[in-house]
Amino acid sequence: MCTAVNTVFAENNNRGDTVNIKIDGSKANTSENFLYRGQGMISCNGSSRLLLDYKEKNPESYNKILEHLYGKNGLKFTHFKVEMGADVNTSSGTEPATMRYEDEKADVTRGAGFQLAADIKKINPDVTLDMLWWSEPKWVSDSSDVYAARYKWYKQTLDAAYETYGLVFDYVSANQNERTVDTDWIIYLSKTLKSEKDCPYDYSEIKIVAADECGTWGISRLMMKNKELCDAVDVIGTHYTSHSDDNTKKLAEEKGKEIWFSEGSSPMNYAQSAYRFDEGKSGLTGLNGVLDIANRMITMVSGGYMTLYEYQPAVAGYYDGVTYCHKQLINACTPWNGYYTLDSGYYMNLHFSQFMDKGWSFIFDACYGDAKVGGDGHALVDAKYSYITACSAEGDYSTIITNTTSEPITYNFEIANLAKADNEVYVWETRGPDEGQEYNANYFKKISTVTPENGKYSVTIKPYSMITVSTVNITDYASDAPAESENTLLALPYSDDFGYSDEFLSSRGNAPLYTTDEGGAFEVAEKNGENVLMQKITKDIKANEWGGTPDPTTNFGDDRWYNYSVSADILTDGEDSYAGIGLRYILADSGRSGYSVTLYENGNWIFFGGKKKVLDGNIADFDSSKWHNVKISALNNDITISVDGKKIIGYKAEEGGYSAGRAALYSSYNNCCFDNVKVEATDSVQPYVNKFDNFDNIFTYSENGWEHSTMDSFKNYKRTISHGTEGAYFTVDFEGTGIILTGVQKGDTVVSIEVDGKTVNKEYVISKISNRQSFLLINGLEQGKHTLKLAVVSGNCSVDAAQVLYDYEAVNKAVTNETSSVAESTDSSDSVPEDNDKSAKSNGGGSGKGSFPFVPVAVGAAAVTAAIGAGVAIAKMKKKKD
């Protein structure tokens, strides 16, 4: 039995590469505030937005994703926290406010968070709920009594969550996320909740979490000095550190306060291919890698007394390219096909969740971590010995161990005072691939069963791996995640006239399908009796910034769209207002991305390449009271723009073009409107690309001259990039009709280029360009297998990704009869509405459901035989300057 209370942690009982662990059940800590709480997730910053579309278009996938997170056969998360949005960007996107005006009834159908909470509760009713604010509505911050106004926002949101979804919140996080601790507000909130009588359930039972600082524990110091504050706070939570200070530990030991890791990272590494270049060839190492995150979850126990780890995010339910992207346990960004992936971090967390249940007691004598803070300040480095142990009241126990060293380590176990001390133990392992294996071949595998002798046994952990040693016996784990072939395209043409049903709109705060807002709030609204898409945030209600918010921007679609056009009917809204459209949207960190055009109410227009203004002009006799049709088209490096059917721009991108990406809509902070949005292919042969990371196996690098970064900026695709110096080279083996290379460049680099063994250009000059821009386009090859070789002649060349063009028509012809019959039987709501060729706003028509012809097109290099063209064209060829 686990009975005693003890917070003495394991000493360094390590002898060389052997560690002695004594697991003594009599030394387990059964104090309630020290019990294991498990893991949770935070829905914030737009990170869950696309899950609403999974729910609508592919409910089976949606339910599976939630089961993976909260189900008994998945991660068994125990906690869920939702951002109380304010329509400003809080890193990777906006969360809509429940109350934009003081006299507005709180609407918790806006955003994904509260609806997710309701659906999670259906899976596990015991999940605890929390909510936290990054910014607050303008009417709150402008109030003469901010605390009273803020409390009104809190309370009416709690009321609406119960009224709409039956949600009962267990916690509220009081302080503004990662900002100065406001002790008076924390006390005010606690007191007012405790005295609240007008409530659908007992709000006095809601516990207070504070103060969500980033890596610091100022709240603990303040609590030690202020009894009223100390009494108000039930849980001390902070972000991105596994080590708490003495004040915090004292509050846990003497005052019974719970300590939480109230926001922590998911792994960021691209394990699928990083194993080729990371330390140990595992795909699991390095800063912010799988083993780093596992060490944070282990060290937080001995180093911080923390009992709950909250992932931000657990699910990447947003598009690629947002700030801090490629950070998730589950990736879910293609709701039209229901595809998602369980990333390496998911399997890491299974080592905890499948063998330790909420309420287990830590045996602190068998918990240890010697990692140091390093890298970006969040990471733990130089860990050699890292492990935690917990037990159940029934006498089961589990120990989780990591090894981030290059040598195996043997752990000698001695078990005492536990009912199952002599039971068999099961060893589960996660590590990188052996030669010739798939990257995930050794994820979460049961590798041995050990029978103790007199309560003693030994287990050896391999380098760059993690194991769980447990008396808990679970069945072999088999993922039912979709196969890669199911990641089908959002095929063109695609259109949306926003004629959704009232039932659909009311279920999701008037959000259309597939859009993710980076600034502002784009919602379906009625205009002159018709549904349109309207930007709802105006300057007078724009909340104070948490970080930085671009002008209103939303984006949607498939990252693999390449040669296509975007058109929309637009209506500006008053003086200095503008509305715009864009394509090839790839990075959301600053609002504008790819190519875009904005049209002002006075007839002025501006054409942008990324954030840079490229061209501008004016349309004479422009009538801003009328709808106008704007269209932007891309065909390889050629961009054309028309207004009301009249061409105003013809532009060829010569330096650092933008390749495949999504569509976007732009607005000023006015109620500008959009309708009849259409996305159409401009090339029936090459409308799409297949994307590959520079670490994927189609790339082969010379042994010398390359520096491979497995954990870089989110501005790089998959956070990877390779830098080559003079003499270095790489080859890319691809199947298609052309290839695009992308990556940030310093400029003045000269490379030589070969295609299929033939020199195409000996002195190709690469100019200075930004992240994810293209520096090479080769096109016009016959459909088939090809090899590109690029060698650095002088300077430095970086490569981030490849985009392979292919003959889409040939792939379509190769679709099986079975697939064709599926497409033919697709519901009419997924068909393309007739194009009535109106250059301005049409009167009805279309499904209003983000319609597209469902054509399953498998990603990857398709084995097709059709040929197109015999020549080779290289965009932006230059001779080296004399």
List PLM regions with ranges:
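Aromatic/acidic polysaccharide-binding cleft in carbohydrate-active enzymes
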Residues: 261-378
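Carbohydrate-binding surface patches
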Residues: 370-423, 464, 728, 737
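C-terminal beta-sandwich/jelly-roll accessory domains of carbohydrate-active enzymes
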Residues: 401-520, 524, 540-544, 613, ...
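Glycan-recognition surfaces in beta-rich domains, encompassing non-catalytic CBMs
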Residues: 464, 671-818, 822
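Secretory/extracellular carbohydrate-interaction modules
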Residues: 538-606
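Short, aromatic/His-centered strand-loop micro-motif at the edge of beta-sheets
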Residues: 609-629
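Flexible glycan-contacting loops in extracellular carbohydrate-active proteins
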Residues: 651-675, 769-771
